[in-house]
Design a protein with these regions (language model features):
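N-terminal metal-binding scaffold of metallo-dependent hydrolase/deaminase domains
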Residues: 1-63, 402-403
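Alpha-helical scaffold segments that flank or form the walls of functional sites
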Residues: 76, 93-144, 150-165, 191-197
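Histidine-centered catalytic micro-motifs
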Residues: 78-90, 145, 231-240
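Active-site gating loops and adjacent loop-to-helix segments of metal-dependent hydrolytic enzymes
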Residues: 90-122, 197-200, 228, 246-267, ...
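Histidine/acidic residue-rich metal-binding segments in metalloenzymes
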Residues: 154-168, 184-292, 309-332, 385
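His/Asp/Glu-enriched, well-ordered alpha-helical/loop segment
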Residues: 252-263, 303, 314-400
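C-terminal cap of metal-dependent C-N hydrolases
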Residues: 368, 372, 388-434
């Protein structure tokens, strides 16, 4: 799967400003600017980055008239990727606050709110999340959708409509999050997979935990994915139980069914509490299998090692450094936003990265860490980016950060978001157009 070209029938989107000819004096991260460091000029043509040259620093006569934009050293990233959201739960904490700490209390509270999930309610909250994501610079958003019965839930149909409406602004993917036990029945596994496969942007998923682990069910799920040509995204080992084996089993079955590059394990918290030999052996298998990891720092920090009246000792963050060292594709996501699982937050991968810099000691944040919030490759939705040349000019500019060096943007608010070089969120400051 590859991202669709930017196009939309939405009037406000179509009426966006003219495409600049050159973005001058941009600061790119090292991971997508392999040549000599320094400010760059990005030359745009036909909605793509045609070439990148070193910024000479000299004034360009009539630059504004030619449609050039001067960024004055502002950081620029390719379009952001939100690899893991829960749009069906977002913005419901006022209706469904958890009664206690931890994952199980959050699940109970969220289930209690499902009586309120009408089509209008689901659509309104999802549209709010999509608008927030667009303003953050997100181009691809994958949401997990609670699915506890054989037939697809109402949210699945609502999000299919929204996917079509938002195409060209945000590519919306939907993953069913179902109890693994539903896949014990091979026929039901095939039925669910067929429904997912018939949905544009559909991805097959399940909740895999030590309390419900079933090798047979996971095998049926992976076999169905292979049969229907589906990608897979599992809530795997979202716990701090050393005996959890969901990630290891997934890697083994991904190899068996030839699913390299099509499987992601989200959370994978248990790796952080396993003995080094077990954890690293699992990561070696993940690397060989071509499985990706999605780290979700906000909810893992909040829900793992959570006990009333006690300060948590453990972070619940998966082994990000060790995974990257093995060439495993890694992405960072926002996960839950203002619901029973996380009462705060927003749909913004940059916020997730800022939290991961602290929780997982990711550095340098801009030159290396930022790759983890632009990584559609980790979702099986494109190749790994090493250069912007030839790619669509889907960019995120941080114009409030005219800082020298290669530090993290001084101000990540007030972003300017481009699709095909055209501004779809934010506005250029007057000095950029002078």
């Amino acid at each position: 799967m590859t991202l669709s070209p930017a196009a939309s029938s939405d009037d406000s989107f179509a009426a966006s400003s003219a495409v600049p000819h050159v973005l001058r004096a941009a600061r790119l991260p090292a991971w997508c600017s392999a040549d000599a460091p320094g400010l760059k000029d990005l030359w745009l043509a036909a909605g793509r980055v045609e070439r990148i040259t070193a910024h000479k620093g000299a004034a360009v006569p009539n630059a504004a008239a030619a449609g050039d934009v001067h960024l004055h050293g502002a950081p620029v990233l390719p379009a952001l990727v939100e690899p893991h959201a829960h749009l069906d739960k977002a913005y419901t904490v006022h209706r469904a606050p958890p009664r206690g700490p931890g994952l199980l209390a959050a699940i109970e509270a969220s289930h209690g709110d499902e009586v309120n999930w009408s089509a209008a309610d689901l659509r309104a909250r999802a549209e709010r999340a999509l608008r927030e994501s667009l303003e953050a610079g997100v181009r691809l958003l994958r949401t997990h959708v609670s699915w506890f019965q054989p037939d697809a839930p109402l949210a699945w149909a609502v999000y299919r409509e929204l996917r079509a409406e938002w195409l060209g602004r945000i590519e919306l993917e939907c993953v069913n999050i179902s109890p693994l036990g539903m896949f014990e029945d091979a026929a039901l596994a095939g039925r669910i997979a067929a429904t997912v496969a018939a949905t544009p942007g559909g991805v097959l998923g399940a909740f895999v935990h030590s309390t419900n682990h079933s090798e047979a069910a996971l095998r049926h799920l992976m076999a169905a994915a292979a049969r229907h040509g589906l990608r897979v995204d599992l809530h795997a080992d979202e716990e701090l139980a050393p005996q959890a084996c969901g990630v290891a089993s997934t890697a083994r079955l991904a190899t068996e069914f030839g699913l390299a590059g099509r499987v992601a394990c989200s959370h994978a918290c248990a790796l952080a509490v396993q003995d080094p030999h077990t954890a690293l052996t699992t990561l070696d298998a993940v690397a060989r299998a071509g499985v990706s990891l999605v780290s979700l720092p906000s909810t893992n920090l909040l829900l793992q090692d959570a006990t009333t009246g006690r300060t948590p000792r453990l972070r619940g963050i998966t082994l990000v450094h060790e995974a990257i060292a093995r060439g495993i594709p890694v992405a960072l996501g926002s996960d839950n936003v203002q619901d029973a699982f996380n009462p705060v937050g927003r749909h913004d991968p940059v916020a997730a990265l800022e939290l991961a810099v602290l929780a997982a000691h990711l550095k340098p944040a801009f030159d290396a860490g930022s790759a983890l919030v632009c990584n559609a490759h980790a979702l099986g939705a494109g190749e790994r980016i090493t250069s912007l040349v030839g790619l669509p000019a889907d960019l995120v500019v941080f114009p409030g950060s005219h800082a020298s060096g290669r530090a993290w943007p001084a101000d990540t608010r007030g972003r300017v978001v481009l699709r095909g070089g055209r501004v779809v969120a934010g506005t250029w400051a007057p000095e950029a157009l002078a």
